[in-house]
Design a protein with these regions (language model features):
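Tryptophan (W) side chains
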Residues: 2-5
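Conserved core segment of the aminotransferase class I/II
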Residues: 8, 256-296
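Short hydrophobic short-linear motifs embedded
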Residues: 13-16
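N-terminal small-domain helix-loop-helix segment of the aminotransferase-like
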Residues: 26-28, 39-130, 137
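Conserved core of the PLP fold type I
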Residues: 87, 92-231, 242-263
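Glycine-centered flexible beta-alpha turn that most often forms the glycine-rich phosphate-binding loop
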Residues: 238
Length: 296
């Protein structure tokens, strides 16, 4: 189709076609918002990215982002290991791989989780682009519009944004100086069910909770596990900070006590480098197939 393009004084392009009237092209398709999916209409930029934009200003000392001190990394050793990997196994390392992640990496991840009392098989591990992708996969699998997700009050802003993108109703459960209060969890479950709502899972950060920083005691972990098991509610245990305690070891991960009801999320973003974007989900056997399909 032959077209003639003209630019008017307002620098808008006009395309003239022999079989159609003159149309004004301003660079944005007509009725663009109407073409979006319903869940995309209210989609907002990540609050975390907004924080990073402010933190990048030279006059700001930011305590907002959980950014590790990369100056402590053995850069020369990491460069040497990377070079050796590419030279000796580059054709494998740079090729397409399984959506579940490289088997040897999953074996190493199991060794890391063993430090927190978790006995896991590499076949149950799904490697993700940071644990943030794991949150997205879980939300995609579980959440329908208006389903309820229980979270600590306050909770990690990145998780809240993900749940809201999938149109979940987020119900906050009270905390104190020791973390999530079990009796408040019971009350939240009763109220939610009385209102006819479906609870899809409880999301919590037991170790050095973001943003409160508290460490959930072992007895509370057991009580919360018992409550959720009795109510048939999955627990999403997000544990980016578990290996960062130096004064005394953290209690064992909740996943160590319940392999069927706890979805465990881990990451190397705090212990190695966030730029690697390596996270993982350790899922119950009943969920593995859905998670693998969602990740591919």
């Amino acid at each position: 189709i032959w077209q003639t393009w003209l630019m008017d004084s307002g620098r808008n392009l006009r395309v003239v076609k022999s079989d159609s009237p003159v149309r004004i092209h301003t660079g944005e398709p007509e009725n663009l918002p109407e073409r979006f999916a319903h869940r995309a209409v209210g989609m907002k930029a990540s609050e975390i990215r907004s924080l990073f934009a402010v933190a990048s200003r030279p006059e700001i000392v930011s305590l907002a982002g959980g950014m590790p001190n990369l100056s402590a990394l053995p850069m020369e050793m990491m460069a040497s290991v990377t070079q050796k990997l590419i030279l000796e196994n580059g054709s494998e390392a740079l090729q397409y791989g399984s959506g579940q992640g490289h088997p040897k990496l999953r074996e190493q991840i199991c060794d890391v989780m063993a430090l927190e009392g978790i006995k896991a098989h590499p076949d149950a591990v799904i490697v993700t682009t940071g644990s943030q992708q794991a949150l997205d996969l879980i939300s995609r699998i579980f959440i329908d519009p208006n389903d309820v997700v229980l979270v600590e009050a306050p909770s990690y802003v990145g998780a809240l944004g993900t749940f809201k993108q999938y149109e979940a109703q987020v119900v906050h459960v009270a905390m104190d100086q020791d973390g999530l209060i079990p009796s408040a969890l019971i009350d939240a479950i009763k109220t939610t069910k009385a209102n006819g709502k479906k609870i899809k899972f409880l999301y919590l950060i037991p170790n050095y909770q973001n943003p409160a920083g508290v460490l959930l005691p072992a007895d509370r972990r057991s009580e919360i596990l018992d409550i959720c098991r009795a109510e048939e509610i999955f627990i999403v245990e997000d544990n980016p900070y578990g290996l960062l305690g130096f004064d005394k070891p953290s209690p064992n991960a909740m996943r160590a006590s319940d392999s069927e009801n706890v979805i465990y999320l881990g990451t190397f973003s705090k212990t190695i480098a966030p730029g690697l974007r390596i996270g993982w989900a350790l899922v119950p056997q009943s969920l593995k197939e859905k998670m693998v399909i969602a990740s591919e």
